[in-house]
Structures are given as C-alpha cells and as structure tokens.
Amino acid sequence: MNKPINLLVGGLTLFAAQGCKAPKQASQQAEHPNIIYVFPDQYRNQAMGFWRQDGFRDKVNFEGDPVHTPNLDAFARESMVLSSAQSNCPLSSPHRGMLLTGMYPNKSGVPLNCNSTRPISSLREDAECIGDVFSKAGYDCAYFGKLHADFPTPNDPEHPGQYVEEKRPAWDAYTPKERRHGFNYWYSYGTFDEHKNPHYWDTDGKRHDPKEWSPLHESGKVISYLKNDGNVRDTKKPFFIM
C-alpha cells in the first residue's frame, strides 16, 4: 500500500489517498490521487492540541489553546502540517468564495455573507471553480455540508416559487445543478446553524432531515460515498471530496 499523503493546514485538512492498486493503476493513481479536502466552519487554528506538543510548538509563534483534540493530534502526526497558512478574509461566505475560485472576495462575486437582501454577493456563475478544474481532469467530484456562497432565491425544489426557509432575510439556500461548478455528487445546504437538527439537499434536489448531529451525519455520508454505497460514483475515476 502506498502511504497516504495528508495535509493539515490550520483548521482545514487535505488528504490524498492512494490505496492498494495494481502497478499500472498505481502509476495512474500517483498522477491523479484521490483527494479529501476537509474544512470546518471558521475553526480557530490555535484550538488544536498538537500545537502544545513536541515537534509542533517550536514551529509557530503562538501558544496553542489548552484543548483536548486526540483525533486531530493523531492525524497531524501522520500529516504534513503547514504552520503559516491563513485566510485573508476569514468570514463564512467570502472565504468560501475564495476557496472555490482562488479569487479575492471583490472578484469571486462573494464580498459579503450571502442572504436574500444581498444580491451583490453570490458566487460568479462564470468563474472556474476548484470543482470545475478537478471535473475536467477526470475526477468524480463530491461536495458535502455547508456551502453559503449563493444568493438565496425562491427556488425550493419541493415548493417552486418559495424560499427554502420562512425567516427574512433568508440565509439558507438551495443550489441547483447548474450552479454546482463541477460537483456531480451533492449533499449540501446553504447555511443553517442548527447542527443538532440539520437538513441537506441531495444531487437530485431531495431534502433530507436526518435528526442527527451534523458532523456525525456528514462523516457518515462521506464514508458511504467512499464505500460507493448505491453506486453513487464512478469507481474508474479518482475522487475529489470537499
């Protein structure tokens, strides 16, 4: 088995897994590794226990928080950890706009947090996003969890002409297929911060209300995708997950 390559960057994680393959497949996989990009919602870099441990604390100019994060610590020990990666706009929507497009907020179309009173803030439809790039490179692309990069419109797939939530301004949003920028598998929502009572729209626009803590539920969905339960991805292709 080729050793997986893990990249841990502050509050985000990039995981490139190669796995067990025949020689020809291994060569192809080395050129197109499977990639899992994990990023939480505005996670504080200092709030990871390994920054207080030997081999890490002397690499940064801050003191890590006194937190207990054994799983992240173990992951860091198996990873390449970048000590100086940062966002120049660490705000929900603008950061996601930059992450997806590689552009500053004044160019990505997302200068502000997206809600129904801010039509000026929505991910540019003509932008080439990271999902577009990986899709064109032959990847099966999947997006899980919060997006919060679209201007909410009355496009509820189950109730045409209505927003997906009643409160105003509307913050949550449904992202139709034509705005998913290369992600062919979808299990996402706009923004809805009731993490013990989450909801999601799948690839076909069906809403799911799992009644489960969102990090646990989303992890389970990612694992299901990796196992290819229900034949949801093309196993002949490498995968890219966000």
Where are these regions (language model features)?
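Formylglycine-dependent sulfatase
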Residues: 3-4, 11-12, 20-242
